[in-house]
UniProtKB/Swiss-Prot annotation:
Record: residues binding substrate: 130, 177, 261
GO biological process: glycerophospholipid metabolic process; phospholipid biosynthetic process
Sequence similarity: Belongs to the glycerol-1-phosphate dehydrogenase family.
Binding site for NAD(+): 103-107, 125-128, 134
An MF annotation (GO) of this entry: metal ion binding
GO cellular component: cytoplasm
InterPro entries referenced in this protein's UniProt entry, alphabetically: G1P_dehydrogenase_arc, G1PDH, Glycerol_DH
Subcellular location: Cytoplasm
EC category name: oxidoreductase
Names of the cofactor(s): Zn(2+)
Signal peptide: none
Stated name of the protein: Glycerol-1-phosphate dehydrogenase [NAD(P)+]
Catalytic activity: sn-glycerol 1-phosphate + NAD(+) = dihydroxyacetone phosphate + NADH + H(+); sn-glycerol 1-phosphate + NADP(+) = dihydroxyacetone phosphate + NADPH + H(+)
Amino acid sequence: MKLTINKNSAKWMQLPRDVLVGHGVLEEIGDVCRDLKLKGNALIVTGNTTRDVAGKRVSTLLENAGSSTEMVLTCRATMEEVDKIMQKASETGATFLLGIGSGRSIDLAKLASTRLEIPFISVPTAASHDGIASSRASIIDNGKNASVQAQAPIAVVADTEIISAAPFRFLVAGCGDIISNYTAVLDWELASRLRNEYFGEYAAALSRMAARVVIENADSIKPEHETSARLVVKALVSNGVAMSIAGSSRPASGSEHMFSHALDRIAPKPALHGEQCGVGTIMMMYLHGGNWQEIRDALKKIGAPTNAEELGIEDRYIVEALLHAHSIRPDRYTILGNGLTPSAAEKVARITKVIS
């Protein structure tokens, strides 16, 4: 039998080399850099709050390990901020970057380091979404949220002592982002069947497993609890790995994410990304004919929003976001197809009790 190899089927997988998750692991960041042969000038990308939470300590630890450090403070995840970081890196001769924060600083360091062609380390101070280990960066470009391909971190250092001390709302949002894997994978399977899109079994299985772990442990996810933080961080890292294996965000981003991005554009005051994705997952699971009640019940146990009122968003914006969600990424086929009718959008939101 002759084996035919399709050269176009080859995929590049970029995964973190070191992942440290646990109590006090921030203190090991110097060892991580030595292990990865990272030396020279480090540029720390962080925010005002996270500078005090972890940024200053990381700077001290790196200098004790023999590196020199500079710090750049960020305020918004915009392309202008990326340019600012790149300029600072060039001025200081940075040989590697560290993103320290709950998401924004990590995404900025991720994209800036990709363009500079130097490695970066992800140091999350909260577990609010799966960007901590993925090769995607959420950036505001020309006033609109965009998901941009970038490099994965060379290492992730997630100190659960720090993460568990962050506002519990961030951890809850991270759970919503993970649980949304269920409908993301269903959308991916649908696109494979109807549009002959590539579907990766391994990436899909890893994505589903992360969501299942969070749902099965929903009762035990509590505030200021390091075990909870560890569980959620590991699931978020698994999401990042699944996306790297797939070569796209498909395993963790489908119609529920498109709904969330539509809300970002429409609602005057959007909620957290993971919170909106969780609510979106309830409705998209209904459209898929799945067990949407299980999704809703798990989110309730964790303390996540399950309706418009809990999101702090008016009912009409939920319906409007459902109507526009399919157009957020026209190239990505989902259960939304070519869009819902106004009556269908209102029906799914009412049946799932997302609106009253």
